[in-house]
C-alpha cells in the first residue's frame, strides 16, 4: 500500500473527487426527470429466490422462464453482470445486451457501487451453478453519492463502524446477522411470556422519583410542569403498582438509562426485560429463566452449547445455584466464614480486593463488595447467585430462615451479570423502613442509594400478592448468543464521544 493511500488527507481528497463525479451523474439524471423514482414494486427477495430454487437445474429454469422483480444495492459491477444486495442477501443480475435497449446499456455503465436499482427478468443458472436474473429491464432508483469502503479492506475501524452504523450494515453481513438475531431474540421472549399469560405493558420513561435500581440517573426539566424529572433507571416500581392493581402477570421490554461509566459491558442507554408474576417466588423465576435461555440458545444456535470467544457455555445443564456467602468461600478458600462474619475483617478484605469502601457500609454490603471483586469474574458457566444481604436488596423479600438475607438471585454467565430477580417485598412497613435506610445511605455519600417513594409505599398498603420479579439485560444476552465482545456490537447506535 502506498504512502498516499495511507495519508488521510489524500484519501479524503480522493473521496471528495468521487463524490463530485457522482453528483454530476445525479444532476444528469435530474435533467432527464429520472432522479429517485418511487413506482417500482418488487415481488421477490434475493435470498428467498436462492432458497426456493436451489434444486432447480439450468435446464429446468430455462424451460420454466420464471419472471421476477428484484431490487437492491449494487455491491459488485462486472459490466456483463452485477451483484445486488437486499435485506435478505444477494443475487446476480445479468446485463443481456440482446434484450436491454442501447440507452439502458449506456446508463448501466455509469452506475456505481452503492447505487440502488430495480431489475425485472427471468431466473437462470450459470455454468458455475450460480442463480441469476436475466434482465429484461433495469433502472436506477437511488443514486449513491458517497463511495462504499474499499472492497478489500471494508469498514474495519471499530469507532467508525459504530459512528456510521448505516455503512457498517451495508458492507458487513455478520453485523446484519447480529441485529437479525437480536430482533429474533426479543420476538421470542415476547412470545414465550405471552404464551404463559403475561401482559405486555408500557410504563413511564420520565419519572419524578428514579427507583427500582441502585444507579445514578440522568436529570432533566419538564418546562410545562416546572418539574425536575429523571430518565428512568428501571420500570420496577411501576410494574409492581400494576400487580397491586390486579394485573398479576406483566412484562415490559424497553430502555433504561443510567448516568454511569461506559465499557464493553455498560452503555448509558440499554434495553431491559422486566417481568413480574403473582403467586410465585424467586425459585420459580430461576426455573423459568433456565427454560427461556435454553429455548433462545436452541433457536439462535441450534444447540444449548453457546460458544463465546474461546469458551463454551452449557445452557443444557442445570445452572449452578450458590449463595453469595458460599460462593466467596468456594472461590477463595483462603477466607473463612469467620472472616466474612466479622465487620472489621470483611472491611479489610474488601479494601484489599480493591473495593471502594466509604466506611459506613454494614456487613452485608461489605460481603457483596468482596463477592464483586473476588468472585464475579470467576463465574464462567451459568450461576444463580442467591441470598443477597438485605442491605443491598431494598426491594426484595427477606428470607424466612435468615432475615439478614433476601430471596434474591443474580444470574452470571461468562463473569457477567445477565439477570437480577427476587421474591418481591410486599410488606409496606418493611419497605418504608428500607427506603429510609437508603435515604440515610444517600446522605452519607452513596450516590446510587434509592430515593424514598411514598406513593409506592402507599400502593403496597393496598396489598400486593406474593410476587416474583426479574430483570434481564437484553444487550448482554444478545452478546452471549452472537459471540460479541462488546455491548456496542449489539446496539445499533451506541453513544460515542463527539469527534474532534
Swiss-Prot record:
UniProt signal peptide: none
Catalysis performed (reactions): tRNA(Lys) + L-lysine + ATP = L-lysyl-tRNA(Lys) + AMP + diphosphate
Residues annotated for Mg(2+) 1 binding in this entry: 410, 417
SUPFAM superfamilies per record: Class II aaRS and biotin synthetases, Nucleic acid-binding proteins
EC number, as in UniProt: 6.1.1.6
Gene Ontology terms for molecular function: ATP binding; lysine-tRNA ligase activity; magnesium ion binding; tRNA binding
Pfam family, one: tRNA-synt_2
Cofactor(s) this protein requires: Mg(2+)
InterPro entries referenced in this protein's UniProt entry, alphabetically: Aa-tRNA-synt_II (IPR004364), aa-tRNA-synth_II (IPR006195), aa-tRNA-synth_II/BPL/LPL (IPR045864), Lys-tRNA-ligase_II (IPR002313), Lys-tRNA-ligase_II_N (IPR044136), Lys-tRNA-synth_II_C (IPR018149), NA-bd_OB-fold (IPR012340), NA-bd_OB_tRNA (IPR004365)
PANTHER family (alphabetical): LYSINE--TRNA LIGASE, CHLOROPLASTIC_MITOCHONDRIAL (PTHR42918:SF15), LYSYL-TRNA SYNTHETASE (PTHR42918)
Family the entry assigns: Belongs to the class-II aminoacyl-tRNA synthetase family.
Subunit structure of this chain's protein: Homodimer.
Protein name, per record: Lysine--tRNA ligase
Organism: Pseudomonas syringae pv. tomato (strain ATCC BAA-871 / DC3000)
Gene: lysS
